[in-house]
C-alpha cells in the first residue's frame, strides 16, 4: 500500500471513532480547516463587527410582524452570504435559524474524518451567532425513507445536478457509466439536506425558508422539500446588475417568473423617461459598453454594422436568415426548461437537422459567449454531429467570435431561442421570434410559442416564407419594449450586496450603512419579500 493509501485508510478508520475528528481539529490542527475543506477567515474577522452593528440597529429597522425563518447555505461563498443575510433578517426582528452543509465541493466526495473536521471548524467559527441565531449542520443528517412524491422530485434533481456539473444534457448512467458515480454522490448529498430540512420544518412552525437559487444541488433539495411540505420557499439569485437581486416566492428564481409583475404593470404604457432608459440600455448592450448599474459587457466587440457581419460570414441577402442564439448547455437558466424537446441541446440538434434540408433558407447559430468558460457538450459540436459536412447555408458563430450579435439581429428574418433574453430583444427590434424553452417571456404576446415539435416546424416554415424585410406590427414591438423595461428595471429587487462582489460591496456599504435610517427604507421591501411577505408588484 502506498503512503497515500495508508493515510487514507487511517483517516477512514479514525473517522468512525466518536469525537476523534473533532479532537484532532481542536488540538492537533489548531482550529485550522482540513486541506480538503475551506476556510472562512474574512467572515471570522468581520463577524464581531457585524454583530455589533445588529445590536446598534435602531427601531426603524424592525419589520412587523416578526416571522420565523430558516435560512439555508451551502458552499463557502453562499455560507458567507447566508450569514450576512441571517443577521440582517435578525436585525429586522425575525427569529432566524441558519442551516448549512460543510462540503467544500459539490462534485467531490469527502471522507468522514475531513467532513467532521470541517463541521467542527464551522461550528466554532459560527458559535458567536448562537445568541441570536440557531444553527443546524445538515451535512450528515440521518436519511429516512422519503415520501414517494418527494423522492421522485429529488431523483429529478439528482439528474439535473449531474447535467449542471458535466455541462451537458446527455448522461451515461448505465452500469459502470461515467456519470453514475457522480449521480450517486449527488443523490446522497441531496437526501441529507432533504432529511434535515424535513425534520426541521416538521418540528417547527416556520413561516418561510430562504434559499439561494433553488434549482440545483443542495439548494434544490432544500427548495423541493419546503414545497413538498407546503412551506413558503423564498429563492434568490443575482444577475448582471449591481445592488439588485432576483427573488421568487414558492418558485425557482432561475425561472424568472414575471407573472405577478406583468399582471400588475404590463398594461401600463412606458413614460418618456422609461422609453429612454430601455433605448439607452439596448444601445449599450449592442455597443459592448457598461451602462448604469449593469456590471457586464454583453458583446466582446462593438457593432461593426450589419453589412460587415454579412460579408464576414458569407451570407446571401436574397434568402431569409434565421438567427439561433443558444444558451450555455447545462446552465441552471436552461436546465429543466424543456417544452417539446429533451432540452436545449436536443432542440438545437433538431433545428440544425431541419435547416440542413432547406437550402432555400439560411441558419446562423450564435453560440453563447459563456461557453468560453467551458462546456461539456459545446454547441458547435452538436451542430457538427448533425451536419458533419456543414453546408454553406448553415453558419456557426463560435463563442470567441468578434462578430456582434446585434449586427446579426439586423440581418435576421427570424429569431430562434430556447430561454435567452436575446429573443425578447429581437422582438423589441421587430424581428419575429420562436421560443422553444420555458423562458420567462413565453406567452407574453410578442413571440411564437409552439408546444410541440410539429407546431414548431410549422411556425418555422410559415415565418421563413414571409416576405423579406417584414417586421412585427408596431403594437407588438411596443409590447416587447414594455416587457423588457419591466423585466430589466422592475423585476430585480434592490439589495446592497451582490454575491460576486460581496466583500467589495460590503466595504462600500457596511452593515451600519445598510441599517441606517437613511438607507434602510430602500431595502425594506426586499427584506419583507425575503421574509415571505407577499410582494405588491403594483408599486413601481
Give the residues covered by each predicted segment.
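Histidine-anchored nucleotide/phosphate-binding helix
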Residues: 76-98, 102, 223, 343-356
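Conserved catalytic-core segment of nucleotide-activated headgroup transferases in glycan assembly
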Residues: 287-385
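Conserved N-terminal ligand/cofactor-binding loop architecture of enzyme catalytic domains
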Residues: 2-68, 91-191, 238-302, 504-505, ...
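A donor-sugar binding/catalytic signature common to diverse glycosyltransferases
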Residues: 244, 401-448
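Conserved nucleotide-sugar donor-interacting segment of glycosyltransferase catalytic cores
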Residues: 192-248
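A short, glycine/small-residue-rich beta-strand->loop->alpha-helix junction that serves as a flexible
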Residues: 72-82, 211, 333-336
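Nucleotide-sugar donor-binding patch of glycosyltransferase catalytic domains
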Residues: 247, 434-479
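Nucleotide-activated donor-binding/catalytic signature segment of Leloir-type glycosyltransferases, i.e.
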Residues: 380-399
